[in-house]
Amino acid sequence: IYGLDADLIMLTINHLPIAKNLFLFRETPHFIRSIDKTLDPNSLYMLRIPDLAQAIINKLNNGNKITKRQEKNRLYDYIFMTFLLGNDFIPHFPALNIRTYGMDHLIDAYAATLGNTDKNITDGKTIYWSNLRLLINNLQENEQKFIEMEYERRNRQAKRQFPNNTKEERDERFQSIPIIERKVELYINPYEDFWQERYYKQLFNIEPTENNIKKICINFLEALEWTFKYYSHKCPDWRWCYKYNYPPLLQDLIRYIPYFETHFIREAVKNPVDK
């Protein structure tokens, strides 16, 4: 499979049950150089998806042996967890940045909560919300620490000089705007008291009342279910969308994740193009 879409790894893993020998080809010289400086970044490399899948299973399951069915479910869980890192439909959590340690935080939390059990977030058909609660609870306990880590990393990056004399320098400066323009982020400041309130006031333009935060959290749970169905079945509702540019905080989301099986999205009858 060849393509530049960021979610191709998840899509190829999702198709392993029906295609055992999948390889992903991408031109990623910067990535190749970052993992091994002895490799030629201009050579062609392919990612063997079955080997990647087995490595993921071993990591999530703490190396324990499990049934083939459970292995498949572990991969479904991995795909589901990546939704928390953001995609075309959902923004990522400030505590979980895929460019830094977001994936590591997810895998560590999963291994600590579900890795030694036979529980799953999903079996590819159903979301088991009570099991998702276990994962999110672990993450929310470390949320402030993770956000502070990101804050410090961005402080270090912001100290870099970004000249703009040449076109190349101006392009790099443009790409670095999230590091340069940080007024809102610095105002929120996770090291200062009541930063959670400032998070909602600044990024959502709302008063952080319980009712307002609940609406955001429910909409985010809808987003998880909608994206899950979009990946595993079909688009459940062509008119649905996540209404905000940012996610709720994990410490708030945990309060609205159900302990039982339920649905937040009802499948709509309408087609993509209404007649």
Annotate the PLM regions.
Residues 1-275:
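Long, low-complexity, charge-dense
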